[in-house]
Amino acid sequence: MELQPADSLKLIQDIIRQRKQKYEENGFFLIFWSVLICLSGIIQFVMLATDYYPRYSWIGWGVLMPLGFFISFFSKMKEGARNRKEKKRTDPLDWLWLMAGLGAISSFCLPFSNWKNYEIAMLVIYLPFSFVSLAIALHLRVSLWVVTSIMGIVLTYSVLFFHYGIALPLLCAVLACLLFLVPGIQFYTNYKKQRHVQ
């Protein structure tokens, strides 16, 4: 069976629409992670700026990131079980998020290494997330997310040229807003609008 160009274009558009709908349904997770990262960054900045137990300023990250991981992990496990039951395929783009997340987890070992350079941790954490966001935004053709992803890449690379000092955790919060919060809100509002239409 041969497909006509119009049929193949329609098929491609349907696949993109289905993936976009999946991200709209999961817009909550983008918002959820952005809030966790923003809270962690703000807590660390306040503790460093006020000199309130600065040695333990990592505590927000140490509590909120594992909490977010377990909540996401178990909800994705339930979703995977439901997809297997309904014989749906999993989105291969989810593996990109997983790989970026594993890179972020590995960066928590940097303070215990000989580098002790938090700018390297910023690059290890946010460059993969920025490029994954950009790849998915380009794939889904979401122009706002493309712009915020490019801004995230530029800001992440800026740690090589500017010394942020104790404001580095605030940069994490800004990057979380650009990479996760802005597209998450856009996806979530689109999803709510579609549910009200149906």
Residue ranges and their predicted role:
Residues Q21-C109:
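Selected alpha-helical membrane-embedding segments in polytopic membrane proteins
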Residues M1-N26:
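N-terminal juxtamembrane cytosolic/stromal segments of multi-pass membrane proteins
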Residues I71-K88, F131-L138, V182-Y188:
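C-terminal ends of transmembrane helices
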Residues D91-S149:
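Membrane-proximal helix-loop-helix units in multi-pass membrane proteins
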Residues V132-Q198:
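Terminal transmembrane helical module of multi-pass membrane proteins
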Residues L36-I43, L67, S106, F129-V132, ...:
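Membrane-embedded alpha-helical transmembrane segments of multi-pass integral membrane proteins
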Residues S57-L67, S113-L127, V174:
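Structural signature of hydrophobic alpha-helical transmembrane segments
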Residues K20-L30, D51-R55, K116-L123, V142, ...:
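Membrane-water interface of alpha-helical transmembrane segments
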